[in-house]
Amino acid sequence: VQWMGFDGNAHNHNNGDVDIGRLSVMAGLNVRDGEAILNPFLGKSFALAAVTTNYELNVDKPLSASSKNGRGIGYWLGMGSAVPGIEWGRREKRATHLSAYPLETVKKVERPTTIILDDEVPQVPKRAEFFARAEAGDLGEKSRVERGRFAFKHPFAMSMVSLIKRMVPEQDGQVYKEKVDNYNDPGANAKALKSISYLLGSEMTGICEIPRYAWYSNRKDGSEIPYKHKYAVVMLVDQGYETMEGASGDDFISGAQSMRAYMRGAEIAGVMAEHLRSNGFSSRAQTNADSDVVHIPLVLWAGLGELSRIGELVLNPFIGPRLKTVVMTTNMPLEVDKPIDFGLQKFCSSCLK
C-alpha cells in the first residue's frame, strides 16, 4: 500500500493501535460467541493481523450470528473454489513429517537421473552467477545497465524485497555451546525437521548430504567459503497454482509470486536454523538473497525432482516448475532421502519436438 503512495500501518495482537478482534467482526471475518470470537470455518484456531490505510476500499458486511458453523455440505465438497473439507481431513490423517503430496510413493533411485560426474564437476565462485556476471559487465553493456531493473515491476513484489533483505543478517548466528544430547537419532531428527518445515509453510522437504560441488568456492569479495556443514534440508515453496493460471504473462504478477515464495522460504529456513543453533548445532539458512550453496544439485539429491529441459530447473512430479527453493545447511545428524525417478527423462527422450 505504501509503495502505491498511500499511508498504511500494520497491527497485530502485541503491537498495534486498534482493536483487531472488533475489526475482524466488523469486516465480516468472525462472529462473537459471548466473550469469544469464532470463525465459521476455523473456530478459534487463528491469529489476527490488520492493516489500516487511507487507500479507499469497499467495505464488507458483518456476518450473521447464525454463521458460526460454516462447515456445511458446500465446505466438504469444496464449492466456491475452496479446498474441500474432505481434503483437509485427508491431510490431518497424514503423519506430520509427510507433505500434503504423496512424495513418499514416488520411485527412489541411488543417483539422480541426470548423469553427474562427481569428480569432474568444478566448484564455482559466487562471482560466476549470471546475475553477478551481468552486474560486472561480462555479458555486455546492455545487460550491465538492465541488471538493476529487476523483475519486481509490481508494488506487491517491491513490498517484499526489503523484508527479504532484512532477514539476511539472521541467516547465520551464534551457536550455543551446550549441545543438547538427546538428538542422536538421525531418523528421528529428520522427521522432526520435516514436521517443523511443514508447520512453517514448506510444500515439500527433502534431506541430502552436501556434495563438494554444491558449495560455492568463494564469495563475491574473494574470501573462501568453508564447508562447515554436512547436511542440507531442502524445501520447496509453491508459487500458487491459481495465481499462475490466472496470470496473463504481461501483468508482472510472476515477480510478486517469486518474491512471496522467497520471503516465505527465508522465514522458514531462518527460524529452523535459529532453532538448531539454540540446541548447539551449527546451521545456516541459504536463501535467494545470500546462499553459500548451489541449490539445483541439492534439490536433485534430496529427492524433490528431476532435471528438466526448461533451462536449469528441477521439475517436481506434483507441482512441476511452480516452485522456489530454500535450503538450510546443518551439522545435526540426519537421515538422508534418495533421488527420485518419476519418468521425466524417458518422457523427454521420447519427445519429437
Go through each PLM region and give its residues:
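Catalytic cores of enzyme domains
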Residues: V1-G70, K194, E203-K353
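Iron-sulfur (Fe-S) cluster-binding modules
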Residues: A65-C208, H229
